[in-house]
Amino acid sequence: MAKLILVTGLAILLNVQLGSSYQLMCYYTSWAKDRPTEGSFKPGNIDPCLCTHLIYAFAGMKNNEITYLSEQDLRDYEALNGLKDRNTELKTLLAIGGWKFGPAPFSSMVSTPQNRQTFIKSVIRFLRQYNFDGLNLDWQYPGSRGSPPKDKHLFSVLVQEMRKAFEEESTLNHIPRLLLTSTGAGFIDVIKSGYKIPELSQSLDYIQVMTYDLHDPKNGYTGENSPLYKSPYDIGKSADLNVDSIITYWKDHGAASEKLIVGFPAYGHTFILSDPSKNGIGDPTVSAGPPGKYTNEQGLLAYFEICTFLNEGATEIFDATQEVPYAYLGNEWVGYDNVRSFKLKAQWLKDNNLGGAVVWPLDMDDFSGSFCHQGRFPLTTTLKRDLNVHSASCKASYRGEL
């Protein structure tokens, strides 16, 4: 018995010292600081002990070179990277691209070897100048949205050339190599059109898969934003609109499990019901829901805004089939995630030996704790706890600077 207690104690001690093998990545969006009053979120509001990686969204591109989008970005870079003073194990990445950025600048950049080298050299200079630890390529998407079919191959070429350049720069200067990650699509047709998965998996450090935005108001019926499993109403191609099917596809087609980072949304999609009495999954809708008070985007509510919706009397239902909740009040309907669904997904992630989780975005979690009354960052904290993510070097706590 004494020997068993000793072994158990050593295992616990080693776990505390070495930390989790899972990554917990968190996006910070540059426009979050512009939200009104209690919804405004700045780099100083970030708890430096919460995530293993912070990803700043987004940088831009000009003449095939990476660039900042505003002078304020430069101040944000300094504040974000200053968090590493309080957590020496924290890594920061700069994301380039995004949905609004579109595929055209990427398509032009990858089209010639000269353009690719111009971009790669600019990335190394830029990341080192502003003290980032790596890059997140958020091209939405190679081979789709007007991007030609050849971009599927050229994206792999870019990633291979960039990884090689990062390694050479590291060796030459005797410094840690820059990290290289890519956002990965969550729709099977887009994945097929855009990615040579085995090649990408070999060169990338991580692939952050967008396992969200799987149902939205454009569909004309209610559906969950990020269901873990399929609904009985999901037939045909819709049967793949769930986290389990998407990640399984990536794994089955050549992605290393430990490099797959599962997307966890800190927001939900909202709908206006055609008939308020028909308020389940798959019921007809007429439009997107009204914009949130703070996020001001039609068809979307941040998690902290959803808590207000619930506090106003909305009925919350937990869909045991898809393992995510939805809620409705009158003709308004929202499909989202909460602490319970994050816990279930975290366990599923561990059961499948995946690399970790990425929260999009951190600034839509209840960062102040004043809306949901579940503590600060309740969704992200759930992942931190359930994935056993911690940093022995991090002594600073959340200070909530403005």
UniProtKB/Swiss-Prot annotation:
Q: Where does chitin bind?
A: S70, E71, G97, G98, W99, K100, Y141, M210, T211, Y212, D213, W360
Q: Which PANTHER family match?
A: CHITINASE, CHITINASE-LIKE PROTEIN 3-RELATED
Q: Which SUPFAM superfamilies match?
A: (Trans)glycosidases (SSF51445), Chitinase insertion domain (SSF54556)
Question: What's the gene?
Answer: Chil4
Instruction: Please provide the Gene Ontology terms (biological process) for this protein.
Output: carbohydrate metabolic process; inflammatory response
List the subcellular locations.
Secreted; Cytoplasm
Q: Where is the GH18 domain?
A: 22-390
The scientific name of the source species is Mus musculus (Mouse)
Q: Which InterPro entries match?
A: Chitinase_II/V-like_cat, Chitinase_insertion_sf, Glyco_hydro18_cat, Glycoside_hydrolase_SF, Glycosyl_Hydrlase_18
GO CC annotation: what is one? Answer: extracellular region
User: What family, per the record?
Assistant: Belongs to the glycosyl hydrolase 18 family. Chitinase class II subfamily.
Protein name (database record): Chitinase-like protein 4
The UniProt induction remark is:
Up-regulated in response to IL4 and IL13 and during the allergic response.
Q: What is its main location?
A: secreted
Q: Which Gene3D superfamilies match?
A: 3.10.50.10, Glycosidases (3.20.20.80)
Disulphide bridges, residue numbers: C26-C51, C307-C372
- Keyword terms: Cytoplasm, Disulfide bond, Inflammatory response, Secreted, Signal
Function statement: Has low chemotactic activity for eosinophils. May play a role in inflammation and allergy. Has no chitinase activity.
Tell me one GO molecular function of this protein.
chitin binding
Q: Does the keyword Disulfide bond apply?
A: yes
N-terminal signal peptide = 1-21
Keyword Cell cycle present in the record's keywords: the answer is no
Describe, from its UniProt entry, the tissues in which this protein is expressed: Detected in stratified squamous epithelium in the junctional region between forestomach and glandular stomach (at protein level). Expression is mainly restricted to stomach.
